[in-house]
Amino acid sequence: GSGANIAYTPTTTTTYYAESFITPTSYTFNYTGGMQTYTVPMGVTSLSVDVYGAQGGFGYNVPTIIPGLGGRVQAVMAVTPGEVLNIWVGGKGGDGGTTVGGTAGFNGGGTGGGWSGGRSGGGGGGASDIRQGGNALSNRVIIGAGGGGSGVNHSSGDAGGNAGGLNGSNGLTGTYLGSGG
């Protein structure tokens, strides 16, 4: 897929469980590249959520070097009936090109490092988050961080780091240094 998911349901990427006086209802939010909303049903005062960040992108021409996976957060959050939650599902980091690093994953991923020598690193995956009481970064209450993009060097690469903080940082741009003769 092209991104992570947020859902109200067990064992899916980003999951919310709305528990009320009736049978619990499950909702899943998939990557769209934009904000989505969820209105808390009447009678519901807490949600069980399962949030995954998106994975990073692959380095150029090194499909066996795996990028980092997004983080996972499971929590129960207090809500108010009728409240509107803002849902942001992170996008997968772009794969590295011959000279240009992979694009940053939607919602906070970092750009992969570029290299003029013909191989560039993958972009970092975007975070998935739930925002309560507004849409600013300071309104984030649950965050599944995105994973790091995989790197490359002259003949191989390094795996991407698994999820970290709120925003990924840009990859480093480097040069290959050969030994002198």
Give the label of every model feature segment.
Residues 41-48, 80-84:
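Extended extracellular/luminal ectodomain segments enriched in beta-structured repeat modules
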Residues 23-34:
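Boundary/junction segments of secreted and surface-exposed precursor proteins
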Residues 1-21:
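Solvent-exposed segments in extracellular or luminal domains encompassing
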Residues 13-17, 46, 84-86:
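Short, conserved beta-strand segments of beta-strand-rich sandwich/propeller modules, principally
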Residues 19-21, 52, 90-92:
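Beta-strand-rich extracellular modules
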Residues 67-180:
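Secretome/extracellular-domain signature
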Residues 4-8, 36, 71-75:
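Short strand-edge motifs at loop-to-beta-strand transitions and within beta-strands
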Residues 1-2, 64-69:
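Short beta-strand segments within Ig-like beta-sandwich modules, predominantly Fibronectin type-III
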